[in-house]
Amino acid sequence: MDKLTDLNYTLNVITLINSTLHTILEDPGMAYFPYIASVLTVLFTLHKASIPTMKIALKTSKCSYKVVKYCIVTIFNTLLKLAGYKEQITTKDEIEKQMDRVIKEMRRHLEMIDKLTTREIEQVELLKRIYDKLMIRATDEIDMSKEINQKNVRTLEEWENGKNPYESKEVTAAM
């Protein structure tokens, strides 16, 4: 117990571990050991996980070819990702799905363009009608009677018997 609390002893153990690790890593054959170990671990995991999964999938699936193809493509894509590649292997089914998706998107865009052009044509026709109604038409004489609200005003010649109805009359009242 005293040795565990001794600082010098602890430092000596750490130094011993570090020197051991450095001698292992300095060996040229051991320099790639972590990479080799990680690749072997991944391959072992894929082997242990994929074989039972493929057996079950082949027994339960009606189309075993597609299942095998999908599993192999998935394994290769995983290995490519581990190797650092951004490209992936795609099957014909995936390409067809992507093409169908692109075609649907293009159809949607074409329908939208068709709707927009129809609306624009309608707007142009509406603007033409508005312009035609707003066009200034030349007239010989402009009737201003509607504008100044004097349509029912009569001149002196038009009054009955030439009398002005608005002139005051002499009114006599009995008292």
Swiss-Prot record:
Residue intervals on the Lumenal side: 1-28
A cellular component term, taken from the record's GO annotations: membrane
Transmembrane annotation, as ranges: 29-51
Keyword Metal-binding appears in the UniProt entry: yes
Membrane topology: Single-pass type III membrane protein
Localisation per UniProt entry: Host rough endoplasmic reticulum membrane; Host membrane, Host caveola; Secreted
InterPro entries (UniProt xref): Rotavirus_NSP4
Cytoplasmic side: 52-175
Annotated GO MF terms: channel activity; metal ion binding; toxin activity
Keywords, in A-Z order: Activation of host autophagy by virus, Calcium, Enterotoxin, Glycoprotein, Host endoplasmic reticulum, Host membrane, Host-virus interaction, Ion channel, Ion transport, Membrane, Metal-binding, Secreted, Signal-anchor, Toxin, Transmembrane, Transmembrane helix, Transport, Viral ion channel, Virulence
Statement: the UniProt record of this protein carries the keyword Transmembrane helix: yes
Binding site for Ca(2+): 120, 123
Record PTM: The N-glycosyl content is primarily Man(9)GlcNAc, with a small amount of Man(8)GlcNAc.
Domain comment (free text): Binds 1 calcium ion per tetramer.
Family label: Belongs to the rotavirus NSP4 family.
Subunit comment: Homotetramer. Interacts with the immature particle in the viroplasm. Interacts with host CAV1, early and late in infection. Interacts with host integrin ITGA1/ITGB1 heterodimer. Interacts with host integrin ITGA2/ITGB1 heterodimer. Interaction with microtubules blocks trafficking to the Golgi apparatus.
Functional summary from the UniProt entry: Plays an essential role in the virus replication cycle by acting as a viroporin. Creates a pore in the host endoplasmic reticulum and as a consequence releases Ca(2+) in the cytoplasm of infected cell. In turn, high levels of cytoplasmic calcium trigger membrane trafficking and transport of viral ER-associated proteins to viroplasms, sites of viral genome replication and immature particle assembly.
Name of protein: Non-structural glycoprotein 4
Top-level taxonomy: Viruses, Riboviria, Orthornavirae, Duplornaviricota, Resentoviricetes
